């Protein structure tokens, strides 16, 4: 019997059809539009997202050799996807990368709310989290709040359209309203945010044992899916990607190479000491995902390519591969986002720098320094993460560069594995569906059977020693630059935050 998995990303919807043995039988993609009606805003039309999903699902269903017996869904997390009592959107979805609630986050940081909330939820607050968006809407669009009956995420919205039932997966709910240890809504968090009134908006919380619902007749008609098949609400995308990469037991690690570099470690305990990064339930019983999503990732490489007159990151990697191992002394600190950096330390004033330039440095040396600087953030996040992983699974568009894969192995000192599946998030949702519907007994068994490794890159130990010295330089340069980050902003430099030692 075949099955379907939906992975609804921010800019692309992906739907994959699977055979029983895990072979990908069909893949359909649909672009989705992010609108920015004002500076810092990021929204999506909820009806358009569902229409794109339904269309892609129907295309896959029509290409399968037999009718699918299950559909699993994962999607982008956070944001606010508000609906009324009839399940109709009360406005556009406010996305995870929306920045309109900066004032709310600044106030919570200043008043100590963010630090206390982290001890309960395990996640650092950001402007695109539901609490910040709700606080902004309550102040600026109270009519919309009054018309809303349920606060959903993208995955919850798609689950509602597929089943008629509003719900949220625990991983999606982990931040900002859930007590990560009790795995339930926290009244104290609502009090801290001053959002007691919003408690009524929270939908049913679905844990690992309650993921399965039945597809509605209307959704079956829209998508071409068979009536009565199970719908599985899988963990949201960063968790599903970890599962799809085979990271399902404590101590395993993965990194998603995208616009952000999300370095993730699986744990069996919750650590809420240094308020940085996020901790969410993985979707695997008894396991948590400790994630460090940086602001310094693929967009920095895009910037570097443009700076050097190149047309793509592929060209940047090719140029960097020709650079000398010592990069002619050039060093790069990659904090280029106007929002600063959020992992493995939090500082909204963080800025990048290119240092050590000389007449001996060529374009290839600068290209290599740029790539190495970005790669150092992966090591920095692993250093801040709990445990000591023995390998690192990589996924995302960056895995197409053989040079970068070898560099990551050498910088981290870990064997790097590349999953055979290009649609890792969808595979993670499918694996969740197999376990949830009893087709596989548990996640380790499911991953062992259905996650294949396409390539493994072993670290060069001599190169790792050299990069360890360079990592120490990276940390020293960062601390030396801190006073410059705030000089032009009239601020006092913050105390050095966690994120790695030598």
Q: Can you name each region flagged by the protein language model?
A:
Residues 62-96, 124-128, 155, 159-179, ...:
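Short beta-strand-loop/turn "lid" adjacent to the catalytic site in phosphate-handling enzymes
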Residues 30, 35, 94-101, 172-174, ...:
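Short, acidic/turn-prone active-site loops that include or flank metal/cofactor-
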């Amino acid at each position: 019997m075949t099955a379907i998995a939906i992975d609804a990303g921010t800019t692309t919807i992906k739907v994959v059809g699977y055979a029983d043995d895990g072979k990908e039988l069909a893949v359909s993609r649909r672009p989705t539009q992010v609108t920015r009606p004002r500076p810092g805003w990021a929204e999506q039309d909820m009806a358009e997202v569902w229409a794109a999903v339904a269309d892609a699902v129907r295309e896959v269903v029509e290409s399968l050799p037999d009718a699918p017996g299950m559909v699993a869904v994962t999607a982008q997390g956070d944001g606010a996807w508000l609906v009324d009592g009839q399940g109709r959107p009360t406005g556009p979805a406010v996305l995870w990368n929306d920045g309109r609630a900066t004032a709310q986050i600044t106030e919570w940081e200043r008043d100590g709310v963010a630090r206390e909330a982290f001890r309960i939820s395990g996640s650092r607050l950001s402007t695109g989290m539901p609490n910040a968006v709700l606080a902004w809407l309550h102040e600026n669009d109270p009519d919309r709040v009054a018309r809303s009956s349920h606060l959903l995420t993208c995955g919850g919205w798609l689950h509602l359209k597929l089943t008629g039932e509003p719900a949220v997966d625990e991983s999606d709910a982990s931040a900002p309203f859930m007590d990560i240890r009790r795995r339930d809504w926290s009244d104290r968090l609502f009090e801290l945010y001053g959002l007691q009134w919003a408690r009524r908006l929270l939908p049913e919380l679905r844990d690992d044992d309650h993921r399965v619902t039945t597809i509605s007749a209307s959704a079956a008609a829209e998508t071409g899916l068979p009536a009565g098949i199970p719908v599985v609400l899988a963990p949201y995308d960063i968790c599903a990607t970890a599962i799809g990469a085979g990271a399902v037991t404590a101590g395993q690690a993965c990194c998603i190479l995208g616009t952000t570099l999300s370095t993730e470690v699986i744990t069996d305990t919750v650590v809420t000491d240094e308020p940085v990064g996020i901790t969410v339930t993985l979707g695997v019983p008894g396991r948590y995902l400790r994630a460090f999503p940086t602001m310094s990732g693929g967009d920095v490489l895009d910037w570097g390519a443009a700076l050097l007159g190149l047309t793509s990151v592929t060209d940047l990697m090719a140029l960097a591969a020709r650079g000398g191992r010592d990069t002619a002394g050039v060093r790069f600190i990659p904090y280029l986002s106007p929002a600063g950096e959020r992992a493995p330390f939090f500082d909204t004033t963080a800025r990048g720098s290119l240092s050590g330039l000389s007449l001996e440095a060529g374009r290839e040396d600068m290209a290599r320094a740029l790539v190495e600087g970005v790669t150092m953030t992966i090591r920095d996040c692993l250093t801040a993460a709990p445990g000591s992983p023995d390998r690192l699974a990589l996924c995302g568009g960056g895995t197409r560069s053989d040079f970068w894969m070898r560099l990551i192995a050498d910088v981290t000192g870990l064997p790097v594995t590349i999953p055979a599946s290009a649609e890792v998030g969808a595979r993670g949702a499918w694996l969740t569906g197999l376990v949830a519907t009893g087709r596989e007994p548990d996640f380790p068994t499911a991953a062992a059977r259905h996650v294949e490794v396409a390539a493994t890159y072993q670290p060069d130990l001599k190169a790792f020693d050299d990069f360890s010295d360079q990592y120490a330089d990276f940390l020293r340069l960062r601390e030396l630059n801190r006073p410059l980050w705030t000089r032009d902003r009239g601020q006092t430099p913050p105390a050095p935050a966690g994120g790695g030692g030598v």
